[in-house]
Structure formats: structure tokens, C-alpha cells
A protein has these predicted regions:
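Ribosome-associated RNA-binding proteins
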Residues: 1-193
Length: 193
């Protein structure tokens, strides 16, 4: 008889079910692994759809994730409840992560850049060490999550969160280090500087 129970336990484990302890209970909680990325909710927007019975409310969340080491991403999620929208946005952001080029040592952007998305234009420029992140709103959140410590920025035009975030991330994607530019032009780094 005890052998049959042992076979059942191994079958349950192989099927993906948790193995029962001696007292017959399942383990209660598993420890969560530390998150790979930190996340910031940039905006939560309540949207409504008018139907025959009245208005149907939903929420749209915009979330930015980053590891403070040059990896950054953003995502949007929609749901009938705010926590569900945030969770969906985080999942989407984790799928859209990319690495941005930063100047080693000073942790600033390699060169100035101006990117337009929709009616929002974002300008980023390198800054001297000790300057800090001179930015506001969504741009500050993105730059801090990316690990930028010294940068100057300006948002021109519309301050719509989605457009500002898209323009800022496009600006970070377009950054090229001196070494990359030298390789593209078939020149030495000293000739570029």
C-alpha cells in the first residue's frame, strides 16, 4: 500500500502539480524572484465608450521599465480595472526592452538629438558630470530608469504622455557612440573627435 502512494506522488510531480508534504497540504507560498526591471506608471487615462445602456468605463495605463544600466522599454495596457491595466502595460513594456548607448564613466548621452513624434518634440543634450537630470515629467522618469545621470532636455509642443515617451525612447534608440560612428565611416576614433 505505501508503494502505491509513492507512485501517485511522483506522478503528481511529473504532471506539474506541487508535491504534497507529509501532512497532506500543499506548500502555501513561493518566494518571488527579484524583478529584473524597475517600473514607473507614467499615466493612467480613463476612457469611456457610450453604449445603449450608458457609458462603459475602461482604463489605459502607460508604463516605463528600466534597469538603471542602459536597458529601457515602455508599454500600454487597457482593462476595466486600474491594476489589470498596469499589469498588462508592464508585460508589454518587458517585451519592448532595448539597450541605449550611454557614455561610460559620465553616464550621459553621447550627443545632442531632437526627435519629433506626433506633435511632441523632445530635445536631449549631453551635460557635464554633476549637472544631474534636467528634465521633467515622463522624460525624467525614462532617463532615470535608463541610468542617465547627467543630461539636459526640453519638450517642445504637445506634452501628451504617449507622444513624449515615444519621442524620448526614439531619441535614446538613435544615439550612436563615437566608436560606432567611426566604424560606419571607416575612420579612426581620433579623426571623428
Amino acid at each position: 500500500m505505501p508503494n502505491e502512494n509513492a507512485e501517485v506522488r511522483t506522478a503528481n510531480t511529473e504532471a506539474g502539480r506541487p508535491q504534497r508534504k507529509e501532512n497532506g497540504r500543499r506548500p502555501q507560498f513561493k518566494r518571488r524572484e527579484p524583478k529584473e526591471f524597475d517600473s514607473v506608471v507614467v499615466s493612467i487615462n480613463r476612457v469611456s465608450k457610450t453604449v445603449k445602456g450608458g457609458r462603459r468605463m475602461r482604463f489605459a495605463a502607460l508604463v516605463v521599465v528600466g534597469d538603471h544600466k542602459g536597458r529601457i522599454g515602455f508599454g500600454m495596457g487597457k482593462a476595466t480595472e486600474v491594476p489589470d491595466a498596469i499589469r498588462k502595460a508592464e508585460e508589454a513594456a518587458n517585451k519592448n526592452v532595448f539597450r541605449c548607448n550611454l557614455v561610460e564613466g559620465t553616464r550621459t548621452v553621447p550627443h545632442s538629438v531632437k526627435v519629433t513624434h506626433g506633435s511632441s518634440t523632445v530635445f536631449l543634450a549631453p551635460a557635464a558630470p554633476g549637472t544631474g537630470v534636467i528634465a521633467g515629467g515622463a522624460v525624467r522618469n525614462i532617463l532615470e530608469l535608463a541610468g542617465v545621470s547627467d543630461v539636459l532636455s526640453k519638450v517642445i509642443g504637445s506634452r501628451t504622455a504617449v507622444n513624449v515617451v515615444s519621442a524620448t525612447l526614439e531619441a535614446l534608440k538613435s544615439m550612436r557612440t563615437v566608436e560606432e560612428v567611426a566604424k560606419i565611416r571607416d575612420k579612426k576614433v581620433a579623426e571623428i573627435r
